[in-house]
A protein has these predicted regions:
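Hydrophobic anchor at the beta1->P-loop junction of P-loop NTPases
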Residues: 7, 37, 151
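Conserved nucleic-acid-binding Ia/Ib motif block in the N-terminal RecA-like helicase ATPase lobe
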Residues: 38, 43-91
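Walker B catalytic acidic pair
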Residues: 122-123
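Pre-Walker A (Motif I) flank of P-loop NTPase domains
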Residues: 2-7, 33, 90, 146-147
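Conserved Walker A/P-loop ATP-binding site and its immediately adjacent core
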Residues: 16-18, 31-54, 157-162
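Walker A/P-loop
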Residues: 2-22
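Conserved helix/coil segment N-terminal to the catalytic DExD/H
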Residues: 73-92, 96-115, 129
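Conserved P-loop NTPase motor "coupling/switch" region that bridges the ATPase
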Residues: 34, 55-65, 117-118, 135-211
Length: 211
């Protein structure tokens, strides 16, 4: 019953199956009754159309709702059914872009607050920017989840700083820093710059990476 895990697994090694197996085990133990799965817009429907149906054991009854900013009647009914009382394992599938919108945040918050849920972010580098609205929203919402998971083959795509927000979503205490800026100051070589009358900090190199 580990509360948080990062599945840093290369493409093709079965991240989706590992997550769904974990969800099934937690559901079987009575630890959760729902899962909120978040993925990039181009692939998030794969979870409802392929991954869950392929890997979730047939003996587990399930309800699946897929988020859409402009839902059809069928989509609306599927999401509403997630809030009905039942013994089914309930999945809400959302694209990460939804968390830049008030409507998307409200839907996810209601789902997490009314279920014992696992929250998973597929391709978690989509939340690597700590200043992005969707990152801030997801980190805040994750506190309402009973369990948290992130999935990606490459957690660092441009800079060691990429890792902070991903791990912060799992547990803000894991890295041992009180804020992104303290993390940045410890691992980055930061200089003050100015442009157009505005000053800002810029990372020009890295240090302490051997830790």
């Amino acid at each position: 019953k580990q509360r948080e895990y990062a599945y840093f697994m290369e493409m093709g090694t079965g991240k989706s199956k590992v997550l769904i197996d974990n969800i099934a085990i937690l559901y079987g133990k009575g630890a959760i009754n729902a899962a909120l799965i978040i993925a990039p817009k181009g692939v998030y429907r794969n979870w409802s159309e392929r991954e869950i149906e392929t890997h979730l054991p047939d003996c587990i009854s399930r309800r699946i709702g897929v988020w859409s900013a402009s839902p059809r009647k069928k989509d609306q009914e599927a999401i509403l059914s997630l809030f009905e009382v039942s013994e089914d394992l309930k999945f809400l599938i959302m694209n990460v872009e939804a968390f830049s919108t008030k409507k998307g945040v409200i839907c996810a918050q209601k789902f997490l607050q009314t279920h014992n849920a696992l929250l998973a972010v597929d391709e978690s580098t989509t939340i690597k920017n700590p200043k992005a609205a969707r990152t801030k929203a997801l980190v805040k919402l994750a506190k309402h989840a009973s369990f948290r998971r992130i999935l990606t083959g490459f957690p660092i795509t441009q800079s060691p700083m990429d890792i902070y927000s991903q791990v912060d979503l799992l547990n803000p205490n894991l890295l041992g820093f009180s804020s992104y800026y303290s993390f940045q100051n410890h691992y980055g070589q930061v200089v003050n710059r100015s442009f157009g009358g505005r000053s800002f900090k810029q990372v020009v190199g890295y240090r302490n990476l051997e830790e």
